Amino acid sequence: MATKILALLALLALFVSATNAFIIPQCSLAPSAIIPQFLRPVTSMGFEHLAVQAYRLQQALAASVLQQPINQLQQQSLAHLTIQTIATQQQQQFLPALSQLDVVNPVAYLQQQVLASNPLALANVAAYQQQQQLQQFLPALSQLAMVNPAAYLQQQQLLSSSPLVVGNAPTYLQQQLLQQIVPALTQLAVANPAAYLQQLLPFNQLTVSNSAAYLQQRQQLLNPLAVPNPLVTAFLQQQQLLPYSQFSLMNPALSWQQPIVGGAIF
């Protein structure tokens, strides 16, 4: 009898616990799609675990951060395309002028084309111009190397040691070329003074500063009445004696042994 009473009490206890029990959903392991659709969003968010909420916030922040660089890259690409369009329009504006320059002077056209792609010209315009001036003297130096290799090597040695070359290479090369041209100009002055004065045109400072005064001076010198002028005669004789003056400065002892050419002055 006692056994039956204990079994009945156990059944009553199980019945009471079954009626009062409730189920806690394990939302931390289940995605939000498994949550019943009839529950309100607030209810479903309330049942979510804190880890799930943090994960959702992290995903939202990551999406927003990833969208910002994409927008910036799109803006940069649009700015780059705009700059390319402006550069193309400017180039199209200069194309007619460059085409005319190509027809008139192909050498200048090629120089303009090289100027835009030369890093030296973009970095240092003065050094680029000096390089262009040096290239103008290269043919004369090449001819000197073919005619007299010893003199060419001597000039190359002086080119690396002379302070004038380091400071101003075009001036040094022009001075060297003038020293080579002086004997030919001296012979031309003896044979034809008018042609000699015409040859001095690129080296005359009066021509560069005042062309009108130079033309007036040239007309006076080429005038038959001005040729017998003793000043003109003395100037031509001084130009004729210029190589011997340089020789006397370099070696005075040997200069006395040279024959006197300008004896007419004495």
Swiss-Prot record:
Keywords: Seed storage protein, Signal, Storage protein. The keyword Membrane does not apply. Residues 1-21 form the signal peptide. The keyword Signal applies. InterPro entries: Seed_Storage_Prolamin, Zein. One of its GO terms (molecular function) is nutrient reservoir activity. Belongs to the zein family. The alpha zeins of 19 kDa and 22 kDa account for 70% of the total zein fraction. They are encoded by a large multigene family. Zeins are major seed storage proteins. This is 22 kDa alpha-zein 8. It comes from Zea mays (Maize). The gene is AZS22-8.
